[in-house]
């Protein structure tokens, strides 16, 4: 089928897409390849239109093309580099389609009309001493029938719990990664690009089929916690009840803000994430969704860049060890602006967790060190005190088990902390004894108190 599309060079300064009234601008980085380009997929019939990139579209390693004559909502796209295709790392939305009997991920064009974006700014931030945080997995938080939510496991479901969180005294939620993950493998393109011979195609097909025939199929494990290489700009579609995850995510943030609850995101970067990508991701969520802060995890090579970025100086930043001296150095090129502040930074470490657990279960020679840490207030920056985290025992586990029992998750006991400083109150695991249950409840209240 022929489509009335026209392609012309465009000039942009960053990767990604910009949606126009009658088309879009596509930009992507390609290094050292024999051929590259854009593949457009017409969503109603999944017919493809391939746009090869020539030097006319290139500015350095950034290739940009302006496509006119398309309706953004009707098209998906992928890029190709030599023999492979891949989704756009800067896509705002991903969708799954089936083509030729195979599942394929397409990047979507999302118009982001002005009325779908929040006004720039965010709610008034609290002092660190006033913040009470709750770490949340969006899907798991309302997945149970006991959540009484009509939108279980979604952004809307979490928004429905805003009043519940407020009544608990929670005034900040830290969300585990909420963006799409990159597909684990690159897909073979349909119809090879010019320059690939028929014999090369046949050899590739033969080798691929031989490997598949001799490799036993392993059941795929769900990446439940959503840590991995991300499409950082695309809120996760499976966390949305609607077909517009961006709008649902934005409305969730607005609802939490209206209830006085700040929203912090965990950003997990792999080694493939550049400093530029990490900085742009943080700026994107602040300007587009009014996010109040970030907990950087994984490869935080952009830590110093993000922490000292003037645009993010009012945005909370959690990490395990900040280079405070380097961050507070005077700007030699512009000394009149003064030294940068670090009051938006907050230290995340397990020292308090370990001491609190040992103190509550009455370990010897821990009282003095616990009291010292309990009353110490960091100068100029924040510090999070917590007794449980998703990387180890839950609060109920902490008073029910002396040893971890991760037997059913396929990891053979390799995951989780080896030493949880826990105490089972006399019985390993669940117990029906009233005195054991009462002791465990008392211990949990003690933990909540400290």
What are these regions (language model features)?
Residues 24-27:
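Structural beta-strand segments of beta-rich domains
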Residues 1-22, 50, 57-135, 142-150:
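The feature marks proteins involved in alpha-glucan
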Residues 132-134, 173-175, 263-265, 294, ...:
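Hydrophobic faces of well-ordered beta-strands that scaffold small-molecule active sites
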Residues 290, 303-450:
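Conserved alpha/beta catalytic core and glycan-binding cleft of carbohydrate-active enzymes
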Residues 147-154, 185-258, 269-288, 405-429:
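Aromatic- and acidic-residue-enriched carbohydrate-binding clefts of CAZyme catalytic domains
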């Amino acid at each position: 089928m022929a489509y009335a599309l026209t392609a012309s060079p465009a000039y942009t300064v960053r990767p990604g897409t910009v949606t126009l009234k009658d088309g879009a601008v596509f930009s992507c980085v390609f290094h050292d390849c024999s051929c590259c380009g854009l593949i457009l997929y017409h969503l109603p019939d999944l017919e493809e239109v391939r746009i090869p990139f020539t030097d006319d579209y290139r500015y350095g390693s950034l290739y940009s093309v302006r496509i006119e004559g398309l309706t953004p909502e009707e098209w998906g796209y992928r890029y190709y580099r030599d023999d492979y295709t891949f989704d756009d790392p800067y896509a705002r939305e991903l969708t799954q389609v089936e083509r030729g009997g195979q599942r394929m991920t397409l990047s979507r064009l999302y118009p982001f009309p002005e009325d779908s974006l929040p006004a720039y700014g965010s709610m008034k931030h609290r002092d660190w001493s006033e913040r009470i945080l709750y770490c949340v997995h969006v899907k798991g938080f309302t997945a149970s029938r006991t959540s009484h939510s009509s939108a279980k496991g979604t952004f809307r479901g979490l928004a429905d719990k805003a009043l519940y969180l407020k009544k608990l005294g929670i005034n900040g939620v830290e969300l585990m990664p909420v963006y799409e993950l990159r597909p684990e493998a690159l897909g073979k393109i349909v119809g090879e690009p010019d320059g690939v011979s028929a014999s090369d195609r046949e050899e590739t097909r033969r080798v691929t089929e031989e490997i598949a025939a001799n490799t036993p199929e392993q059941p795929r494990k769900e990446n439940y916690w959503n840590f991995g290489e991300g499409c950082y700009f695309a809120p996760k579609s499976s966390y949305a009840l609607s077909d517009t995850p961006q709008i649902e995510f934005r409305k969730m943030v607005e609802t939490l803000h209206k209830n006085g609850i700040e929203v912090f995101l965990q950003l997990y970067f792999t080694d493939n994430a550049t400093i530029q990508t990490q900085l742009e991701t943080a700026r994107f969520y602040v300007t587009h969704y009014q996010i109040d802060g970030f907990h950087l995890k994984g490869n935080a090579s952009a830590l110093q860049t993000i922490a000292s970025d003037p645009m993010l100086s009012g945005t909370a930043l959690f990490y395990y060890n900040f280079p405070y001296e380097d961050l507070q150095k005077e700007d030699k090129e512009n000394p009149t602006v003064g030294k940068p502040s670090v009051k938006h930074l907050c230290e995340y470490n397990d020292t308090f967790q370990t001491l609190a657990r040992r103190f509550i279960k009455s370990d010897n020679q821990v009282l003095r060190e616990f009291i010292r840490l309990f009353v110490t207030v960091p100068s100029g920056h924040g510090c999070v005190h917590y007794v449980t985290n998703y990387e180890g025992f839950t609060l109920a586990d902490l008073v029910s088990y002396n040893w971890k029992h991760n037997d059913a998750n396929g990891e053979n006991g390799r995951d989780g902390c080896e030493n949880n400083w826990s105490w089972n109150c006399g019985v390993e695991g669940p117990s029906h004894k009233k005195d054991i249950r009462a002791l465990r409840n008392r211990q949990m209240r003690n933990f909540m108190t400290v």
